């Protein structure tokens, strides 16, 4: 199993660039509480956000974050641009217990996971609607 450990937020990403890896259908507060991660409040050009930093495996830096004004209680995951791939997403899911529902994932992290929380292959009902 891949490990996930709390760490301090780094000021720089190893590649000098980060990307959103995924949007998890898990409330930020629940996730950081369950993982016992310290939370830091920051402000960027989109507003205030709560951030919790962690180390995935031996060296990959991961930020879990949520914009305070966002009414949707999901958790965004940011990683170094050099770690934006399917193995990072797979390791993250493994570290979180394997069954974390992913609302959206960066296309560069592999094929999107279209399974809904109930395990169906069409969570939005688009096939039945003819979309």
Which residues are covered by each model-predicted region?
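A cross-family detector of function-defining hotspots
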Residues: 1-71, 82-126, 130-131
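Beta-strand/loop substructures that line and gate deep hydrophobic ligand-binding cavities in soluble
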Residues: 73-78
């Amino acid at each position: 199993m891949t490990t996930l450990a709390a760490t301090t937020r780094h000021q720089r990403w190893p590649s000098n660039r980060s990307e959103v890896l995924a949007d998890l259908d898990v409330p930020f507060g629940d996730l950081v509480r369950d993982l016992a991660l310290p939370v830091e409040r920051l402000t960027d050009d989109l507003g205030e956000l709560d951030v919790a930093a962690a180390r995935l495996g031996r060296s990959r830096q991961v930020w879990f974050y949520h914009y305070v004004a966002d009414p949707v209680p999901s958790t965004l995951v940011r990683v170094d641009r050099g770690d934006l791939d399917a193995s990072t997403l797979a390791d993250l899911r493994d570290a979180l217990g394997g069954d974390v529902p992913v609302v959206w994932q960066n296309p560069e992290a592999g094929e999107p996971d279209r399974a809904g929380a109930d395990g169906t292959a069409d969570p939005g009902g688009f096939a039945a609607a003819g979309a």
